[in-house]
């Protein structure tokens, strides 16, 4: 069954469903169940003891589509997680904590492997990172690159 027909870049950047999101890219997109919660004017995603604030446009789309107080699938590519202190300090509402299981140096980049709610996740970071297995670190999420999928249908809600 053909899931999506598009250019390779659009398949990677704008997958239509969880299957395409997980299939395109290596390492694959991190796909994590998250609860959508409205807190005053803000909408946040809660998962694995972490809470991240959604940008206003994405928050409004979830409110309008009726996803507040439901569980969705949050998708974030490994390269859209960053352990740079500059990025973390600039976006404190979009930071998660993770305990590193595996550190894999690949020359020009490092893959950090960690778990969130028993889901294996990966961050692709700068090779100068000081993170090592056993360390609990902060990772900033590029919320402009966040994907959200319906938990039941696995179809994209927003990119």
Language-model segment annotations:
Residues 1-51:
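Internal alpha/beta loop-helix hairpins
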Residues 32, 50-53, 96, 119-123:
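Short beta-strand segments
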